[in-house]
Amino acid sequence: MSAHLTVQVCYALPGEQTLIQLQLPPGVTLRQAIDASGVLTRHPEIDLTKHKTGVYGKLKPLDAVLADHDRVEIYRPLIVDPKLARQRRVEKSRQEGSVEGRKWLPKDSR
């Protein structure tokens, strides 16, 4: 086993992605990796009490111990409710007359 772990810390905004690679000692937690990366000073809008964190798309608590080659991800809160966004997409496709949008209409009104 190596003396250090290679870990990446990732935070993505719509127009900018931050990916920082670190060498950290074994037994390091998710919170320690985020602090060591400096991503909190680079992006002061990150609030770890509101933003969820994870490793490779799986939600993890801040005290989770990391393994070698883990990618720590900081997730932004959702801007739009997923159910509402889907309803808007269906309405838009109905208005545009696409086959996908019309499949939800009764057969006699197609």
Swiss-Prot record:
This is Protein RnfH. Pfam families: Ub-RnfH. InterPro entries: Mopterin_synth/thiamin_S_b (IPR016155), RnfH (IPR005346), RnfH_sf (IPR037021). Belongs to the UPF0125 (RnfH) family. NCBIfam families: PRK01777.1 (NF002490). It comes from the Bacteria. It comes from Paraburkholderia phymatum (strain DSM 17167 / CIP 108236 / LMG 21445 / STM815) (Burkholderia phymatum). Residues 88-110 have a biased composition (Basic and acidic residues). Residues 86-110 are annotated as: Disordered. PANTHER family: UPF0125 PROTEIN RATB. Transmembrane segments: none annotated.
